[in-house]
Design a protein with these regions (language model features):
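Short conserved beta-strand and strand-loop elements enriched in small hydrophobics
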Residues: 35-37
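Acidic, proline/glycine-rich low-complexity IDRs
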Residues: 1-33, 55-122
């Protein structure tokens, strides 16, 4: 099972890594550097994990919809920067930095992720 690994340091670079390499790739990120891990890119079912210096976010593609993992019901929209772009995101969907990678490491049982975690419309 492979994952696309994108890093902005400061320019964008991308490579394919094995799921077993995700934890080490995450740990090797220099301080202050953004990364995105994408499983099953451009397919009906996909998982995208953006890791930022202060937080992570997880987006799931499933059943022709996108879902953002949430850890609270706080729907206040906040401005965030992911990679080189600015977004607004529900505060309750901003996760602890390590959590995104922990979710990604469970992707081999993709369907169970939808039931194990809480999700908001993405």
């Amino acid at each position: 099972m492979t994952v696309q690994f994108e890093v902005w340091n400061p320019a964008r670079s991308e490579r394919t890594i094995g799921l077993d390499e995700v934890r080490e790739a995450y740990r090797s990120l220099p301080e202050g550097i953004s990364a995105i891990f994408t499983w099953n890119d451009c397919e009906e079912e996909c998982l995208i994990v953006a890791v930022e210096p202060e937080f992570s976010v997880v987006t799931m593609g499933r059943d022709a919809s996108f879902w953002n993992l949430k850890i609270s019901d706080d729907t206040e929209e906040v401005e965030i920067r992911m990679g080189a772009d600015d977004f607004t995101w529900a505060r309750g969907c901003l996760l602890p930095r390590d959590m995104g990678v922990e979710v990604l490491l469970k992707v081999e049982d993709f369907d169970s992720l939808f039931w194990e975690y809480s999700w908001a419309d993405g």
